[in-house]
């Protein structure tokens, strides 16, 4: 696979002498082999490629056939692979045009037993799609008895990130797919079984979230997911895309205010509470601003801090004594989730954010009115009904990135149509801070926010801390001061909570964390073994 690397650059900002240097992400681009894709398209029955017909014209006709089921498929700058029976679809369209009934009355019959896509977004950076399947409806998968359809994700990347020090997961061949996709490899990383292959010069990734362990009731295990993935990959067909003349991507600059804020202070990225990492591992000292964005909370002040290792007041009490500046990173705090960017290989997938103290505190650590959450960027919503996680996905000529919000109430999100196929504008109200985690009042009143970027191993979590710092500076109109010395005693303010550094809370005695079934205590690197921890669908943090 040919790539065009883009060297990481420093942001042009007048940082203080002590502040860490803000970085831009390092990107690579796939060089798409459109002649090879054209040759593959030419063999599709029903397309009737004409002599001397150019590849753009052929793909234009192919896109016209597919777009009813894959909206805006022509926007993809890479060839789109999907489980769509394009040959039957083309034959049926010819029959319908001549007044002959087609062979399929229901559009879903074109998807080889899979449901029509729950999400599809194509653009200059590539495409991402989410399909689903009810295993009990498929003869060869009917022994996998689950009440809900299983989701399968597929991505084709023109733009992807090159992450420093990301551990290389163990790769295994899949003999059943080798003939069709030479070099395809299966791996397990960050809670997903993943299938990586290159075609037409483009890296593609198919992934299914699964539990790596013994069979459990109502839980998809990875040996079952493997069978579903093989069925899915065998159904893939080349169904669209458009050759595009695009310049190499240039990550946008994140502009910081020139004036210092008199109050906002923060510890640098990776400065998690001592002892709070998995096996005392440190945090991830990542100064990368992965994208310019709006801060996810509508109003300031807001506080980035630990929900576990910082002293907490009782339920329903005013939180002003708990949450104050300075901010502290808690990406890679000890959790049961695999995160490749964490030095210990396991940890917190994002950053917890607490809003200002409640105007009207209620019981069970809730607020009335609740604090509003807004879209950090203009983009496409990716979320199925009942799911707790909501993503905003951005796909343009310079970026491919997704932002995830957790702990909003699924019922309210369903009622307000915060679902796939909806687009939002930056700053648009999308919900409220809540306490939902698998159930109401399942966690403290806060927002979990994380960022995922595409890599040659698929979508992975990266440290959102500095991205949030810069977004918050934009919200308050002043640059924060990074702290390097040990926390000192906070000085009380007559007008509200302390604004100087607070004394660090002593973390609890180091304990061996309780790991989930299937996690290897002797392995600290995601993907080092197929027996590794997984995160529950759409509820990880």
Regions found by a protein language model. Give the residues of each.
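Short glycine/threonine/proline-enriched tight-turn/helix- or strand-capping micro-motif at secondary-structure
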Residues: 286, 290-373
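Short, surface-exposed secondary-structure boundary micro-motifs
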Residues: 386, 429-435
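N-terminal signal peptide c-region/cleavage motif recognized by signal peptidases
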Residues: 12-16
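Surface-exposed amphipathic alpha-helical segments
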Residues: 207-249
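Acidic, glycine-rich catalytic/binding loops that coordinate metals and/or anionic ligands
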Residues: 254-293, 374, 413-428, 439-541
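Short, solvent-exposed recognition patches
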Residues: 21-202
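Zn2+-dependent peptidoglycan hydrolase active-site motif and core
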Residues: 340, 347-349, 363-417, 444-450
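Sec-dependent signal peptide recognition
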Residues: 2-9
């Amino acid at each position: 696979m040919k790539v065009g690397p883009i060297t990481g650059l420093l942001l042009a900002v007048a940082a203080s002498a002590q502040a860490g240097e803000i970085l831009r992400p390092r990107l690579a681009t796939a060089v798409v082999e459109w002649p090879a894709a054209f040759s593959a398209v030419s063999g599709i029955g029903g397309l009737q490629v004409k002599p001397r017909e150019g590849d753009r014209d052929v793909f234009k006709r192919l896109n016209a056939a597919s777009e009813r089921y894959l909206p805006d498929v022509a926007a993809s700058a890479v060839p789109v692979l999907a489980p769509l029976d394009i040959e039957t679809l083309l034959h049926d369209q010819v029959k319908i045009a001549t007044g002959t009934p087609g062979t399929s009355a229901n559009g879903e019959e074109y998807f080889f037993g899979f449901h029509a896509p729950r999400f599809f977004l194509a653009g200059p950076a590539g495409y991402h799609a989410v399909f689903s399947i009810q295993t009990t409806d498929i003869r060869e998968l009917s022994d996998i008895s689950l009440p809900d359809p299983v989701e399968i994700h597929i991505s084709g990347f023109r733009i992807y990130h090159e992450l420093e020090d990301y551990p290389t997961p163990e790769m295994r061949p899949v003999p059943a797919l080798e003939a069709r996709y030479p070099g395809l490899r299966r791996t397990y990383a960050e809670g997903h079984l993943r299938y990586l292959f290159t075609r037409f010069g483009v890296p593609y990734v198919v992934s299914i979230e699964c539990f790596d362990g013994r069979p459990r009731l109502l839980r998809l295990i990875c040996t079952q997911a493997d069978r579903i993935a093989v069925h899915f990959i065998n159904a893939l067909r080349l169904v669209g895309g458009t050759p595009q003349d695009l310049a190499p991507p240039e990550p946008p600059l994140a502009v910081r205010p020139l004036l210092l804020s008199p109050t906002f202070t923060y510890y640098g990225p990776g400065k998690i509470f001592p002892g709070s990492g998995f096996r005392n591992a440190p945090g991830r000292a990542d100064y990368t601003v992965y994208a310019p964005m709006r801060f996810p909370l509508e109003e300031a002040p807001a506080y980035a801090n630990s929900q576990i290792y910082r002293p907490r007041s009782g339920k329903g009490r005013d939180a002003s004594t708990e949450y104050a500046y300075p901010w502290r990173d808690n990406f890679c705090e000890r959790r049961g989730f695999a995160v490749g960017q964490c030095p210990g290989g396991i940890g917190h997938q994002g950053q917890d954010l607490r809003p200002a103290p409640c105007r009207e505190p209620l019981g069970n650590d809730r607020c009335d009115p609740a604090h509003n959450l807004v879209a950090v960027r203009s983009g496409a919503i990716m979320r199925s009904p009942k799911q707790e996680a909501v993503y905003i996905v951005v796909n343009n000529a310079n970026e491919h990135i997704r932002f995830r919000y957790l702990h909003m109430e699924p019922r309210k999100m369903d009622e307000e149509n915060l679902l796939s196929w909806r687009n939002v504008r930056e700053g648009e109200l999308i919900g409220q801070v809540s306490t939902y985690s698998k159930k109401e009042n399942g966690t403290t009143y806060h927002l979990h926010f994380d960022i995922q970027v595409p890599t040659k191993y698929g979508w992975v979590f990266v440290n959102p801390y500095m991205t949030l710092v810069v977004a918050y500076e934009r919200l308050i109109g002043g640059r924060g001061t990074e702290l390097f010395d040990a926390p000192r005693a906070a000085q009380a303010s007559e007008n509200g909570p302390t604004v100087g550094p607070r004394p660090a809370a002593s973390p609890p005695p180091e304990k061996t964390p309780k790991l989930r079934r299937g996690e290897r205590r002797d392995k600290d690197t995601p993907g080092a073994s197929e027996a590794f921890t997984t995160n529950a669908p759409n509820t990880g943090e």
